[in-house]
Amino acid sequence: MKVGLVLEGGGMRGLYTAGVLDVMMDNHFMPDVVCGTSAGVTFGVNLLSQQKGRVLRYNCRYVGNKRYISLHSWLTTGNMINKDFAYDLLPRSLDPFDEEQYERSPAVFYATITNMHTGEAEYVQITNTWEQMDVIRASASLPIICQPVEWNGEKYLDGGLADNIPLDKCMELGCDKIIIVLTRPAGYHRNDHISGVCHLFYPRYKALLKTIANRNANYNARIEQINRLEAEGKVFVIRPSRHIEVGRLEQDADRLRALHALGVDDALGVWEQLESYLHKDGI
């Protein structure tokens, strides 16, 4: 049996995912493969480093701090999420990320990024977070409010533009048991309208603009696929059991705590079912 874990993006809605991952750590659960996008990457790496509570702790501690996520950072650096603070000072000094434990993990971790030239998703195995911090940052570089990230001679943006729920990659890697953590409740239908604005910011990147234009349809089709596979018992889905109003760049620490608590409660509520799914068919 090869177990995969798929982590949807969603900015600060990823605090729900962090709650689910904290329950996994409490239960000493580690998949063989993790495929994440955006916040599913920046928060998901903490499962491999076994740092329960870290995502909630640093987000609640620094939310509202203009050095972290702020209009001030956007106006002065071009990045609403300040790259020097979020991807250097914070993980190295303020709330250190345990790279040694990450590298000891038996799991492999893939980050999804969107190539601006091709408009396609690329999946990069993260073997060392410090050496590949640009990939991690690219996966969560939201269009317009974050600068593109250059890596290996190409420019990249948020992986969620091309593949917000990297299920196909997880299947391609041979996982026969797949757990999917979503950040939207059942029945959510994407209908955002960023395509027109992106034409003003990225007029030279025609393939990227096409990907963005198709983003709603592709996301909704992915959810339909997941719902079908879930009904067939082929994947196990953990999603918010109720709606909590949390924005992509939420600045209210109480809302973040509430969403994290919901992730914990939902994961605990389905844990026995998850174990049954993993051991079904006599495995």
Predicted regions and their residues:
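Patatin-like phospholipase
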Residues: M1-T37, V45-I283
